[in-house]
Each structure stands twice: as C-alpha cells, then as structure tokens.
C-alpha cells in the first residue's frame, strides 16, 4: 500500500508524458508489480504498439493522400496516393516512451469527398479494446467523431469484426501489432 501511495504521489504531477492517468489505471487493474514493469518498459521505449494498414482502392478514381490527424503516435512510413485498382500500405506507430496507444486518422481525397480511416490500438489491453472506423464525408473527420460515431459517422467496429460503411469494408486484428485491411469500392 505504501508503494502505491508513493507511486500516486510520483505520477500525479505528471500532466504530460510517460505516465499520468494511464499508469494509475494500470496500477489499479493489474497490480503493483505488473504496473511497475509496464512503466519501466514505457520509459525505456520497449513497448511497441502499431497498426499497419493496407488500403485496397477498387474504385475508378485515385485516392489522394490528404494528411493525418494524430491522436497518439504518428505515421512512420511514406503516405502516398493510391491509384485505381491498387493497394497502398502504411504503418502508424505509438510514440516512444509514452503510455499511450497507436491512435489516429488517415485522410484520402476521393473526388469531392474525403475518405477518413481511423484506428485505435490501446496501450493497455487490460483497460481498453481496439476499434476501427471509416467514413466518407465532405471534410476531414476528427478522431473523436469517428471514435464516438458522431456527426454522420457510424459507431466504430471493435477489432476482430468486419465493418462495412460508405462503400468500404474493413477489418482490424485485435493485437498489439495490428493489421488493418480496408477495401474501398467508392
């Protein structure tokens, strides 16, 4: 108990960075020893979370790379346009040394619309689940709207299940090194 109180006093002042609320959640859920090991792994940069995504463009138009919305982590590969009848691949990785997952949105321009692709791979699988969503809209969608199913976006699909929305089928595996398959038909 004394160790827990010391950790709380140590971690609470950290408003940004390696620990904060996520570490406290780990302590409460998995116990002090496991929490200390996870915190140590984060500080040493050993914890890896990412999603690699293959976007298959089955439409007759090019998907133009429009940018990303970073929630946690960033794209670690080249973000390129995807011609018709082609597949583009990229990797989104969590930030090193942060107790956060690999979370964000990738945007492609499709004609006068925007294809928004969201994935959320949690840092702590004991507390959170992986989710994915896709939405074709008139503008770039925020992570929050896609994650919460707001402003015209459908509620996200939990990893391990096929989702289908706006002419797009998608599947996200439920693991730390997730694979995300997106099939866009336009």
From Swiss-Prot:
Segments traversing the membrane: none
Signal sequence residues: 1-18
Superkingdom as given in the UniProt entry: Eukaryota
Localization (cell): Nematocyst; Secreted; Target cell membrane
Keywords carried by this UniProt record: Cytolysis, Membrane, Nematocyst, Secreted, Signal, Target cell membrane, Target membrane, Toxin, Transmembrane
Tissue: Expressed female germline during oogenesis.
Principal location listed in the UniProt entry: other
GO cellular component, one term: pore complex
Pfam families: Anemone_cytotox
Listed GO biological process terms: cytolysis in another organism; monoatomic cation transport; pore complex assembly
Chain ranges for the short sequence motif Cell attachment site, crucial for protein stability as given in the UniProt record: 158-160
Region called N-terminal region, residue ranges: 29-48
A GO term, aspect molecular function: toxin activity
Similarity annotation: Belongs to the actinoporin family. HALT subfamily.
Subunit field text: Octamer or nonamer in membranes. Monomer in the soluble state. In vitro, interacts with folate receptor alpha (of target organism).
PANTHER family (alphabetical): BRYOPORIN
Primary role: Pore-forming protein that forms hydrophilic pores and causes cytolysis. Compared to equinatoxin-2 (AC P61914), it reveals lower cytolysis activity (5-12-fold difference, tested on erythrocytes), a larger pore size (probably 2-3 nm) and different affinity to membrane lipids (100-fold lower affinity to sphingomyelin). Binds to sulfatides (SFT) as well as to the two sphingolipids, lysophosphatidic acid (LPA) and sphingosine-1-phosphate (S1P). It seems to bind more strongly to LPA than to S1P and SFT.
Domain notes: Composed of a long N-terminal alpha-helix and a core region rich in beta-sheet structures. Before the pore formation, the alpha-helix binds the lipid membrane, partitions into the lipid-water interface and stabilizes the monomeric molecule on the membrane. Finally, it traverses the bilayer, thus forming the transmembrane pore.
Name under which the protein is recorded: Hydra actinoporin-like toxin 1
High-level lineage: Eukaryota, Metazoa, Cnidaria, Hydrozoa, Hydroidolina
């Amino acid at each position: 108990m004394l160790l827990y109180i010391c950790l709380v006093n140590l971690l609470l002042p950290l408003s940004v960075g390696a620990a904060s609320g996520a570490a406290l959640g780990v302590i409460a859920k998995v116990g002090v020893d496991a929490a200390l090991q996870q915190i140590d792994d984060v500080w040493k940069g050993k914890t890896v979370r990412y999603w690699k995504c293959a976007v298959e463009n089955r439409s007759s138009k090019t998907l133009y790379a429009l940018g990303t919305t970073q929630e946690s982590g960033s794209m670690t590969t080249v973000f390129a346009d995807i011609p018709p009848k082609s597949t583009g691949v990229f990797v989104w990785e969590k930030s090193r040394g942060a107790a956060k997952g690999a979370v964000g949105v990738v945007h492609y321009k499709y004609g006068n619309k925007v294809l928004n692709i969201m994935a959320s791979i949690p840092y702590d699988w004991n507390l959170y689940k992986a989710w994915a969503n896709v939405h074709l809209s008139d503008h770039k969608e925020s992570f929050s709207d896609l994650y919460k199913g707001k402003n015209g976006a459908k509620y996200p699909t939990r990893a391990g299940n096929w989702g289908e929305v706006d002419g797009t089928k998608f599947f996200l595996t439920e693991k730390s090194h997730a694979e995300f398959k997106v099939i866009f038909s336009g």
